[in-house]
Amino acid sequence: MNFEKLMRNVEKRNMSAYFAKDKEEAVKTALEIMESCRAHKEKSNVTVAWGGSVTLDEVGIKEALAKEGYSAFNPYSYPPSEQARAKKMALLADVFLTSTNAITEDGELVNIDGNGNRVAAMIYGPDKVIYIIGRNKVTDTVENAYKRIKEITCPKNAVRLGRKTPCTNGACTPCLIPGQTMCSHTVITRFSSVKGRVHIIFVDEELGY
């Protein structure tokens, strides 16, 4: 994979790009970005939130945040009755951590959400957004990014989340099931209107779905 070309294509879209050879280097890079973002704030006053992400769990970034003393805000730690409010609060975080469902070789991020809170924070709200992306999520076109999400990402996430949708059997169909449907919102990010807001760390490992 030509990471140098991929990073150039991301940079031309007004987003910052970084390369990490493994999970450990990805976490180190993310912490360095956060350090540069916090200005004169104490770490304990820098709020960090995240969207649901297997990649973030795999790299260990949440544990690193706790060790470094950042004010981590986990909306998923709240009782189900309070999670909707908590997810709204995450939009006010200083830093939002996430991965992506797919990214094209030309640097376009492609994401599909069930509730929309994750893609909402990607687009607007938090001052900084840091993506950690494994090499398995790179596709050649938007069309193949969408295909990857429908055939790999959504089915695996549906099983992980215990959803009662057709894609749990590996056959993704355009279902319309309240509270269950995985593919309610589709977002393609082709440009960041605010320079310095979006930071993308590419990791030379397979991570997440």
Model-flagged regions — what are they?
Residues 2-87, 91-97:
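N-terminal active-site beta-alpha-beta segment that forms phosphate/nucleotide-binding
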